[in-house]
């Protein structure tokens, strides 16, 4: 629960504005923006679609065809109708050459040699004439002729960006997107803030899958203020989402079918295995087995696991894999030895749940089913149920919890984990019954007490929840779990000062434990509050609290380097410090460590948004505009 508080703060507390991607001070930038844009689209679906049509249609128009005024506003409907009424007349003029006056060859083509001999001002004037004829060919959808006349105009005046931009509009119509990019780039080399060229190049890059390039141009457009944000923002959001998914899929394909192969944080492991009786689990190895080497390997693995230390978890992971391989080999030669089957089932069961914790669901289910086939235990059914619950197959996973109950109705972890599932599904009545059952079967385990207290809070009974926490503190005065989870509830209520005191108590209690209990949870929880408090005044950062949050999260990353929440929180603060490279590395690490696809996508989105920010910052002109944008938002109290 403690690690999740930072994520909740990040995703709920920042203003969703375009500057979070392009200017970057607001911590999570793109993901918050992405989530809130989706809500806006649901609320204003028609308006958003209309705006998108306006901006994307504009990308394919030439300089004289765009139904937008010079200030970026849309031309009135009556003016549009006038243009349509005159379209046939203009088409006829384009074919005949009527209305254009420039030196021509006998075949009617412009005499470029003669035109080049004129003065610069005359060349520019004739270049406009040639461009105008190109525009009429464009209107008639004779794009090859339009391109030819725009090229003539360029020969006379190569420093006019409109000519290159109009050629790009022709190539949009013919579908040659590489040429669109080529000619919009030429226009932008002359005039870097040319809005039509920026939009066209962004659209072409999106179609070609160059989403980062598209985001760059769209961010510049937004900073320039050339378009209504409602037109540009959905395009930026769309490209950011596509880029994040592209990168995430590429990363997943490198490790296809094997999950992350990285253990979750020590804090998560301690919480997961905390409900199990360590002495009972270690002693579950059948000592009558004749296979001493395999027995010793399995026994050592479980002892290491329940030592609940950083080294213990890593070694247990390795030993369980080796133990499973050894038992597979032994079973190939002997399938009737009962002690062998029991120990093999135990090794497969724990290796399976480790695969699950590493987000390798398929292998986890195969190993757990194999364990059940050899020798079913409550744990094998519990673990299999959890793998199915992770796939949101609710009906099936409850079936396996029931099998665990049928096998041993007095086993506390079954009720605890099933209660957790009921809790998640907001079935508080059944959750309470299961937590109470787990509590009665093992009154010396703190976790059912904590969940019952949290359950009261979720039901809107804070006073009762607080009283239950206080009673639990009296029973477990030295355990850091109680103040840690109580601090989570206080944080959720906005009682930050009291929450910080509880986190400090939890931190001191954790430091004197031989085993990991709540790990870095108190550090992350306190850092979350301090980070939030440091930015309460939009006009001035509280540097003392901000630096304290940085220090806590840095320490958390050192103590538990596999914690994606510590890294993503530290990355957010590094981004505020303009330490973009460090932020990107931390976001990318978080994406690797994250367990769910949503979490991986979130961290990847952060990283890709930060990369765009870095690219924008590298341009001194754009960087200056970003600072102006930030100053404007700060003045309005939006950051």
UniProtKB/Swiss-Prot annotation:
GO biological process terms held by the UniProt record: protein import into mitochondrial matrix; protein insertion into mitochondrial inner membrane; protein targeting to mitochondrion
Transmembrane segments: 15-32
Membrane topology of this protein: Single-pass membrane protein
Basic residues bias (residue ranges): 79-93
Alphabetic keyword roster: Membrane, Mitochondrion, Mitochondrion outer membrane, Phosphoprotein, Repeat, TPR repeat, Transmembrane, Transmembrane helix
Record GO cellular component, one term: mitochondrial outer membrane
GO MF annotation, one: protein transmembrane transporter activity
Ranges where the record places region Disordered: 45-106
Keyword GTP-binding: no
Localisation: Mitochondrion outer membrane
TPR repeat ranges, renumbered to this chain: 127-160, 162-194, 345-378, 379-411, 412-445, 447-479, 480-513, 530-563, 565-597
Segments in the Cytoplasmic topological domain: 33-639
Mitochondrial intermembrane side: 1-14
Misc remark: Present with 4110 molecules/cell in log phase SD medium.
Description of how the protein assembles with itself and partners: Interacts with TOM40, TOM70 and MBF1.
Protein's job: Involved in MBF1-mediated mitochondrial morphogenesis.
Family membership: Belongs to the Tom70 family.
Name assigned to this protein: Protein TOM71
Organism: Saccharomyces cerevisiae (strain ATCC 204508 / S288c)
Taxonomy of the source species: Eukaryota, Fungi, Dikarya, Ascomycota, Saccharomycotina
């Amino acid at each position: 629960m403690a690690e999740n508080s930072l994520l909740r703060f990040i995703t709920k507390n920042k203003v969703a504005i375009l500057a979070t991607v392009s200017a970057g001070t607001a911590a999570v930038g793109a993901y918050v923006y992405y989530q809130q844009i989706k809500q806006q689209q649901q609320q204003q679906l028609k308006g958003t679609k209309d705006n998108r049509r306006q901006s994307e249609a504009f990308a394919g128009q030439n300089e004289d065809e765009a139904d937008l005024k010079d200030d970026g506003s849309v031309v009135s409907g009556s003016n549009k109708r006038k243009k349509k009424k005159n379209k046939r007349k203009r088409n006829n003029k384009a074919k005949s050459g009527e209305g254009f006056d420039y030196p021509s060859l006998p075949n009617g083509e412009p005499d470029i040699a003669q035109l080049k001999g004129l003065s610069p001002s005359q060349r520019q004037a004739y270049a406009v004439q040639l461009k105008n004829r190109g525009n009429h060919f464009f209107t008639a959808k004779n794009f090859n002729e339009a391109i030819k006349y725009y090229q003539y105009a360029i020969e006379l005046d190569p420093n006019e960006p409109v000519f290159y931009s109009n050629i790009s509009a022709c190539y949009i119509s013919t579908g040659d997107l590489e040429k669109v990019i080529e000619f919009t780039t030429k226009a932008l080399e002359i005039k870097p803030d040319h809005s039509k060229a920026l939009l066209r190049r962004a659209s072409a890059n999106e179609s070609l899958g160059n989403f980062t390039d598209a985001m760059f141009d769209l961010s510049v457009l937004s900073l320039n203020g050339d378009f209504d944000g409602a037109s540009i923002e959905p395009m930026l959001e769309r490209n950011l989402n596509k880029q994040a998914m592209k990168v995430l899929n590429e990363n997943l394909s490198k490790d296809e079918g094997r999950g992350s192969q990285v253990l979750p944080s020590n804090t998560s492991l301690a919480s997961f295995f905390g409900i199990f009786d360590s002495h009972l689990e270690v002693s579950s190895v059948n000592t009558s087995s004749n296979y001493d080497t395999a027995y010793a390997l399995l026994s050592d693995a479980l002892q290491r696991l329940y030592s609940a230390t950083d080294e213990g978890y890593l070694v247990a992971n390795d030993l369980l894999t080796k133990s499973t391989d050894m038992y597979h080999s032994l079973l190939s030669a002997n399938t009737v030895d009962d002690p062998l089957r029991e120990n093999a089932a135990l090794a497969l069961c724990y290796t399976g749940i480790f695969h699950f914790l590493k987000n390798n669901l398929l292998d986890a289910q195969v190993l757990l089913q194999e364990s059940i086939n050899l020798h079913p235990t409550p744990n094998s059914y519990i673990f299999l149920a959890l793998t199915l619950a992770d796939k949101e197959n609710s009906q099936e996973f409850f079936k396996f919890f029931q099998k665990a109950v049928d096998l041993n109705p007095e086993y506390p972890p079954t009720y605890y984990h099933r209660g957790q599932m009921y809790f998640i599904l907001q079935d508080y009545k059944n959750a309470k019954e299961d937590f109470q059952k787990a509590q009665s079967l093992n009154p010396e385990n703190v976790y059912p007490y904590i969940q019952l207290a949290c359950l009261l809070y979720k039901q809107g009974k804070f006073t009762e929840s607080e009283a239950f926490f206080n009673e639990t503190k009296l029973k477990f005065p030295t355990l850091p779990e109680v103040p840690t989870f109580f601090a989570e509830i206080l944080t959720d209520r906005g009682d930050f000062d009291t929450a910080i005191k509880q986190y400090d108590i939890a931190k001191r209690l954790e430091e004197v434990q031989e085993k990991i209990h709540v790990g870095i949870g108190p550090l992350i929880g306190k850092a979350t509050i301090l980070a939030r408090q440091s930015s309460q005044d939009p006009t001035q950062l509280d540097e003392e609290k901000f630096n304290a949050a940085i220090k806590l999260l840095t320490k958390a990353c050192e103590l538990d380097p596999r914690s994606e929440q510590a890294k993503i929180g530290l990355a957010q603060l590094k981004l505020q410090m303009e330490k973009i490279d460090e932020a990107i590395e931390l976001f990318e690490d978080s994406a690797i460590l994250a367990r769910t696809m949503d979490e991986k996508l979130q961290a990847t989105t952060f990283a890709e948004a930060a990369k765009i920010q870095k690219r924008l910052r590298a341009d001194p002109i754009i960087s200056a505009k970003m600072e102006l944008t930030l100053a404007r938002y700060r003045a309005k109290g939006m950051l």
